[in-house]
Amino acid sequence: MSDFWHKLGCCVVEKPQPKKKRKRIDRSMIGEPMNFVHLTHIGSGDMGASDGLPKAGTVQEQMRSKCGRDRQWSNSRVL
């Protein structure tokens, strides 16, 4: 009888758990933005004439005045 259990034991191998598939996100799962606060509008007059990019100082001043904070905006990442 022990020979039976020995043979059965060698055939039963623990199978690795299948990797969980990540659920694919589609448009129906995404809702409207929450807690959105419109701070400023950047118009064509705010664009730099030479490079076509916003002038960092002007945009930062507009945002600072709109949000009412005295936060110092970092100039480390200027577009």
Swiss-Prot record:
InterPro entries: CRIB_dom, CRIB_dom_sf, SPEC. The keyword Transmembrane helix does not apply. One of its GO terms (molecular function) is small GTPase binding. Residues 30-43 form the CRIB domain. Its main location: cytoplasm. It is found in: Cytoplasm, Cytoskeleton; Cell membrane. Residues 41-79 are annotated as: Disordered. Residues 63-72 have a biased composition (Basic and acidic residues). It is a lipid-anchor. One of its GO terms (cellular component) is cytoskeleton. One of its GO terms (biological process) is regulation of Rho protein signal transduction. A lipid is attached at residues 10-11 (S-palmitoyl cysteine). It comes from the Eukaryota. Keywords: Cell membrane, Cell shape, Cytoplasm, Cytoskeleton, Lipoprotein, Membrane, Palmitate. Belongs to the CDC42SE/SPEC family. Probably involved in the organization of the actin cytoskeleton by acting downstream of CDC42, inducing actin filament assembly. This is CDC42 small effector protein 1-B. It comes from Xenopus laevis (African clawed frog). The lineage of its organism: Eukaryota, Metazoa, Chordata, Craniata, Vertebrata.
